[in-house]
Structures are given as C-alpha cells and as structure tokens.
Amino acid sequence: RLMETAAKQLEPEGYFKEDVGAFWEILETRPYMRVCYTYFDALISCGMMHRAIGEGQRLLELCENDNLGVRYQLMHLYAYMEDEMHALALHKQFDSYEETQMLLPLAVLYYKLNQFDKAEDYIKRLSAANKDAKKFLRAAAQERLEDYFDQLNPFGYQPFTMEELLEELMKSSYLFDSVPYFFAWANSCLRAQTTAKKKAAGKAGSNKKL
C-alpha cells in the first residue's frame, strides 16, 4: 500500500511517463525508489525470489544508473535460480565490469550448473579483481571468517576488499547457503593455480641456469 500511495502521488506530475530511467536523479522520486528497494529487500527475506527478481528488474528500469546497487542483489538472485541467460545479460548491461559482486555469484552460478571450467574462470577473475579474494576463500573454506567480521566498518565497505566480500556473504546468504561445498572447491582451484605458477617459475629458473 505504501508503494501504491507513493506512486499515485507521482503520477499526476508525469514522472512515470517522462523520467523513467532517471528516477534517482530527481529528488522528488528518490523516496519512491527507497520504498521500492525496501520492498525488494523484504521479498528476498521472505524467500519470494521470483517476485524479488521482477521488482529488481523494475527498479533497474526506473533507474538505469543503478545508484542503489540493485544489480548486485539481482545477480545473486539469478545465480540462485540458475538463470544463466539473465545473469549474463545483466553483466553485459553494466559493461561486463569486473566487480566483486558480479564475479562471485557468476562463479556460483556455473558451479551450480556443473560447468566447473567456467566457474573456475570467474574465480580467477575474482582473484585478479579483488586483492583479498584468496584470503577470503581460504578463510571460508576453513570456516574462519569470524576472524574478519570484527574488521567490518558499520558505515560501509571499501570496494575490492575483504570487507566487500563479507558484506556480500551476509546480504546474499541465501545463495551461499545453497552451495555448502562451493568455498572449499573455489579455494582448491586457486591453490592449484598457485602451485602451477610456482612450478612454472621453477622450470623457468632452471632453464636460465642451463
């Protein structure tokens, strides 16, 4: 009802006809966006994932720049629902930017789809984009993440850090709870990559000596 009331107040001004796509840029429509985001978040908390996806998509239509970060939660929802087509389209919509909260759910998506090569590729891309990804995955695999939660800033997180990964884990727990062995698998992928690099470096050093 709150959303309906807020929408009725905006309709006479023509915002839904003239300003769709730029709702966050207009001060008069920002409160409506906040109400809709709260509803979006509540749908997820209630486990109404299909309805949450629909509301998330609508929010992105109203605000194409996504100032509220709806795309991140929407990506986790697509991964949860194993919706590869919409997940890839969403990533492309935002220029396929290598962001923590895009790459990790995409890795989970392909893990759930049993496409481990693609999942591993996204894990490696995550590791390249976020300097703390290896540390995070190792701690998650060893069930030691509690050691880092005290470091969280209550006023927000710094992108591409452990803080962002922990924030993501808490906000999208429904996804990560659905794949209890994912972190152990992802950590083993990065360990294998590190071992391979060390062996390659060792061989290169031996060849130089010869």
Predicted regions and their residues:
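Residue-level signature for tetratricopeptide repeat
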Residues: 42, 75-77, 109-110
